[in-house]
Amino acid sequence: LLANTLNYVFDTANPFEAVMVDTCITSAVKNKPAAENLVRFMDGRKNLLQPERLTVAQSVYLNTQNSVIFKPSELNMRIYELYGEKVKALYDKWWDKIKTSRDIEKNKRELEEYRASLKPGDVALLGCLTEGGQGLATANNGKYIAVRSTTKWAENIRVSRPKKLADFLARTPKAITAEMRRYPSYVAFLQSLSEAEIAELFDSLKEQYGRDIFGQGYLYKIVDDCEIADVDSLTNDEKENGIETTKPYYVPYDKGDKDGNRWYLETPFAIAWSKENVRFLKTDPKARYQGYTFYFREGLCWSDINTTFLKCRIKQKSIHDVKSMSIFGVCDKVPEKYILCVINSTLISYYVDTFVNNTQTFQINDARQLPIIVPTSEQLSFCNTLAKTAIVQKIKGKESSNTQKELDDFITNQIFGLV
């Protein structure tokens, strides 16, 4: 579109009752735009009949990261003036070298030299400062994934399992056993079994009648904390090839977070990391054994579903799945707690929505495009203290709006200079 002479852009938002899409109307002439061409921007999101009218040089859009067309509001133009051309230059130089984990590894030495050259106040793309990406896809979560017995998820499973079993057996009465008929209800039947026996029953029924007989992705296994291995005590071979079943062989599993927790969440999930399972996951054509170089590393993660605000949190030493986007800091000048603060600021959510991706997902390649300001030692100290405070508040269930306001003011004014 921007290769043509753009006359106007009319942002109509979503004028339809049923269709869940935002729309806009544009007018362009099919010829090369003049350097001084001005574009009329009309924002009709609040009032289609009397839209807000603004004017912007077409060259602004051409000189913006991804050549994105944005509303030329006072704030957006201030962001453009400070960072537009800088970030575009960084994107043009580095994107082909950081757009995948393989590219980052291929250009490792050049990236290390670049990181070493950074100084406070410099702008860098997050993808130049971190590694990581998507994680494991098992193709059969019910078989491999369990829920810790002390979590709310475990109680949900205890309630849902009898109904799932009853619904399946109503459809497949030949699967009803004599043992089941001895009990007045499937609730009573399941209560007579140990967790290991319930897991074996559900696994067996799935093997006989199909992977999704209880619903796609349904989790039915519950494990006690004593069944979860101490990650710090695992050998490199156990991390890479699995654990003997004579020992606790479940390990923490970060499966994404539908609730959208910020700062911290102790994952309620665990994956059966036995030697047999790991061997199968590595060879199963339906599974995706990806991101394995980052398994059992602390880092940062978020769910790929973005509900208005980005929600980033500390990732404990675990296996992470395909829905849990994970990054790992590799630059001492820009540590993870600082990145955590920047991503959790309201400004970065606004920046992503305006300049990077305004859909409802926030993928790893969106994160790699974020501009990060290299902090001073004082700024770094402030963010470390604030992140620790926010994490403690999260663990205690006492999140504070004052902490978020303090964070937003600091990131917007002190870090990005948008006073």
Q: What role is predicted for each listed range?
A:
Residues D11-T12, A28-V29, S303-I305, I373-P375, ...:
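Generic beta-strand/beta-sheet core signal
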Residues D203-K317:
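Flexible, glycine/threonine-enriched loop-and-boundary segments that flank and lead into catalytic domains
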Residues I25-S27, Y253, A272, C301, ...:
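Structured core elements
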